[in-house]
């Protein structure tokens, strides 16, 4: 078994303190868990990562000198998501673990709510890398609350490039019903980039593209 380096000892220090439940002074509970499964945490660490937590702990109810350890319910997260959230907070923040990546969508929202901008950036990168036919519409909606230009543009671009498949899916029908304005924007962009094929030379053209040769002016352009 490899011996941890000094750097690994240093970067893993907070996680070690958390795992040992040393000097725990606050408990975090998810919406779907009971008191017995609350997660141990430390106010100082949470406050150092998040201004929202810092402001929360400055309230009188948390300043009262007592041996009682307060339990805070973070209702926007499930238990396994909260575990991943605390895991990241106690990490060196250099990258997302496999466990945190698994919950990138929910942690993206949590990072925005608790103003942990570095976590939000990492989750955004993970979400963009995972763009697919199955989740592109969902990520486009996610990018609106609050508006995230990078995620919005990447999602739009993916949808535009795969519009023929996405537009024929049941998911798109539901998307149109729930997000009519976004659906209109998608169709506007998609119409501009529709591809046509010349029956004369076989070349492809966009609707706004130039003819590649004279024969294209006489060939029939067909949608592909």
Curated annotation (Swiss-Prot):
Pfam families reported for this sequence: BTB (PF00651)
Keywords for this protein: Ubl conjugation pathway
Entry's Gene Ontology BP terms: protein ubiquitination
Biochemical pathway: Protein modification; protein ubiquitination
Boundaries of every BTB domain copy: 24-98
Superkingdom of the organism of origin: Eukaryota
UniProt cross-references to PANTHER family, sorted A to Z: BTB/POZ DOMAIN CONTAINING PROTEIN, EXPRESSED-RELATED, GENOME ASSEMBLY, CHROMOSOME: A05
Function: May act as a substrate-specific adapter of an E3 ubiquitin-protein ligase complex (CUL3-RBX1-BTB) which mediates the ubiquitination and subsequent proteasomal degradation of target proteins.
Binding partners and assembly: Interacts with CUL3A.
Domain notes: The BTB/POZ-like domain may mediate the interaction with some component of ubiquitin ligase complexes.
Protein name: BTB/POZ domain-containing protein At5g48510
Native source species: Arabidopsis thaliana
């Amino acid at each position: 078994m490899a011996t941890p380096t000094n750097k690994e000892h240093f970067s893993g220090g907070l996680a070690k303190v958390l795992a040992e439940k040393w000097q725990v002074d606050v408990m975090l509970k998810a919406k779907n868990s009971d008191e017995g499964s609350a997660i141990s945490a430390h106010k100082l660490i949470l406050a150092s990562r998040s201004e929202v937590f810092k402001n929360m702990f400055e309230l009188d109810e948390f300043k009262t000198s007592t041996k009682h350890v307060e339990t805070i319910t973070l209702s926007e997260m499930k238990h396994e998501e909260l575990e991943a959230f605390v895991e990241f907070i106690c990490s060196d923040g250099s990258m997302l673990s496999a466990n945190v990546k698994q919950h990138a969508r929910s942690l993206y929202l949590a990072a925005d709510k608790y103003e942990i901008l570095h976590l939000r950036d990492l989750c955004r990168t993970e979400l963009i890398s995972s763009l697919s036919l199955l989740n592109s519409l969902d990520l486009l909606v996610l990018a609106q609350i609050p508006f995230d230009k990078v995620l919005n543009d990447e999602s739009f671009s993916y949808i535009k490039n795969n519009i023929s498949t996405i537009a024929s899916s049941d998911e798109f029908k539901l998307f149109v019903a729930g997000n009519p304005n976004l659906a209109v924007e998608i169709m506007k962009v998609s119409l501009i980039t529709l591809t046509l094929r010349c029956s004369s030379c076989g070349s492809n053209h966009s609707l706004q593209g130039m003819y590649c040769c004279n024969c294209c002016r006489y060939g029939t352009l067909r949608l592909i």
